[in-house]
């Protein structure tokens, strides 16, 4: 049989189904759970069960029935807050207590800071020229030092209004800008 081993912050028995709340990363976990014959859940008690509600778990249909993914704004929600599996698929729940291990980025240097300033200045100029609305547009950010420099420069630029963003990983710089009110909403695959 095929097995899926996944991490969760909460596992709830709800009749014939098990509700699994992932931790900081979802990615392909719903697909692994759907395709596996048996699922082993690592219940990580270092991750708060209050993470339930952060996730928007959605799997598109297989072709040829696949349709567009109906996300039209950054804050749209189209899925569920947990992964559900039939109760008979759950093989085991193994408890652990391990915080996320996140590698640190090197500090920003003159080059990365200048890149950030240039991007922010370019976007500001595009707004002033009318090619970007005065309310700004959602951005898509990568991960790492250059992304942090760009986000920092956008956040520091008073002529750029609070904005929304898509990203693969909602990293510390994004959370900081959310706390400051500079990012209104962020959508990502991992925290």
Model-assigned labels for residue ranges:
Residues 1-138, 145-191:
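Conserved phosphate- and dinucleotide-binding cores of soluble alpha/beta proteins
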């Amino acid at each position: 049989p095929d097995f899926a081993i996944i991490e969760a912050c909460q596992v709830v028995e709800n009749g014939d189904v098990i509700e699994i709340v992932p931790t900081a990363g979802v990615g392909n976990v719903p697909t692994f759970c759907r395709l596996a014959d048996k699922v082993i859940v690592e219940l990580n008690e270092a991750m708060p069960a209050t993470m339930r509600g952060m996730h928007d778990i959605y799997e598109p249909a297989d072709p040829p029935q696949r349709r567009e993914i109906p996300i039209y704004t950054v804050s749209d929600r189209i899925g569920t807050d947990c992964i559900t599996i039939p109760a008979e698929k759950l093989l085991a729940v193994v408890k652990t207590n391990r915080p996320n291990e996140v590698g640190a980025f090197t500090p920003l240097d003159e080059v990365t800071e200048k890149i950030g300033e240039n991007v922010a200045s370019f976007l500001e100029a595009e707004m002033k020229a009318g090619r970007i609305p005065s309310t700004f547009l959602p951005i898509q950010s990568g991960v790492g030092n250059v992304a942090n420099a760009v986000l920092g420069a956008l956040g520091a630029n008073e002529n750029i209004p609070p904005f929304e963003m898509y990203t693969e990983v909602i990293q510390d710089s994004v959370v900081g800008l959310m706390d400051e009110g500079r990012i209104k909403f962020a959508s990502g695959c991992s925290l």
